Amino acid sequence: DTKYALGSVLNHVLLHQTIIGTEAMAQLEMANDYPDVIVGCTGGGSNFAGIAFPFLGAQLRGGKKVRIVAVEPSACPSLTRGRYAYDFGDTAHLTPLTKMHTLGSTFTPPGFHAGGLRYHGMAPLVSHIKELGLIEAVGYQQLQCFEAGVQFARAEGIVPAPEANHAVKGAIDEAIRCREEGVSRAILFNLCGHGHFDMQAYIDYFGGKLQDLDYDEAELAMALAGLPSVKAA
């Protein structure tokens, strides 16, 4: 007998991950600080929700307003280019149908190095708050994210995972925006993983073997055409 448990996309997984943001709030309280902007990378949504949801919850209960930015790969842009529709949360179609931003459960993203972000659909709760306008979403190409990761490693002595490079790139862009606007903002981002097991990706980057990848429009259209038909009750 086999049981199938997803580690992302489903809402209960997001709930468990909120320990990340809860701990971040406690740490910031110790530092007597609070973020103006929160940046997180997104694939299925668990890491992003983990850092963002506690702060969003505080905001909705009357707390300080924060800008929340979800960063995803341009090659797998479920939030920025996907359709808000009912779909399966997995390619095997074992999950319940949930309403999400999706590229279609049969969509196969190109093989870029941030494997944890190669997911066709976004968690229902993350999708819902995007529809409500509570978060923003932006897509980045692979090479600019690796460039940001190298910059971070040289400055901080920590090599980020390719997935985390997306959040690093988003945070750097927010800092540049502050400089251009002449304002000071506290920027919080989640470095969700180290790159110790991704050295080959960095070797390929420095060797000029990586390239920016885009999704196939025809394949995306075919995947979206196969979305389940759901009739309203």
What positions do the PLM features span?
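Conserved PLP-enzyme active-site core in the AAT-like
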Residues: 17-21, 48-49, 53
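Buried hydrophobic packing segments
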Residues: 25-27, 51-55, 149, 167-175
